[in-house]
Amino acid sequence: LFDAASPAQRNTWITDNADRVLIGTSNTANLVAGNFAASLLNVTPAMTLSGALINRMKRSAKALLFPRIRPFKLKENGTEWFVLFCGQEQFRDAQNDNDIKTANQNSRARENQGYLKNPIFVDGDLLYNGVIIREIPELSSRLPVFYKTAGNGATRISPAFLCGQGAAAWCWGKMPTPTFRREDDYQYIRGAGLKMAYGIGKIAKLTNNVNLKEWGVYTAFLAAASDL
């Protein structure tokens, strides 16, 4: 769908969502107002996912006034949690980031087989400053063609999505109901199934009848070099 969008549609999107988008390491320096392609041209190979950029995304998301991006959950001790969805290359960059590495080396529990929950030793999500970093391989395998040479010097770019409450909607058109198949051939063929109608998608909020802002999502466009 993104590949099918026209340059004008992409420009409208970045104009509407300029307050909830990070281009490389800086919006003030890299965002070209009203021009999506020109903005991505400012992303260099060094602008990869890191602990510092995750902190920046989280600060920016929490500072938004409307629509607010709220944490998707609060723990008993009052800590706030967001989820960052990224592709394989960005997850690799996060794993190799010194700040995230140090946090896992020095801040994780060691007793009671704590190593079994440490991503240095086992596969799974990364945790950093109240953000769950989750790898989504399909964000790499289905990366729109446009992104593959969109950055400075044909740098490969991939989006990462910091999500809070209401980042996506699951809408039911018809709730699940059972269905049965019966044949009169001595009851040798019997079956049961479910029928339902639903849809899943991102939510957008129309503000001032002008800007269609994404709800609950802060998007970063970062370098994501392929190593395959």
Regions from the PLM with identified roles:
Residues 22-71, 78-83, 89-228:
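Sequence/fold signature of self-assembling virion shell proteins
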Residues 1-20:
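Short, glycine/acidic-rich hinge or "gate" loops at secondary-structure transitions
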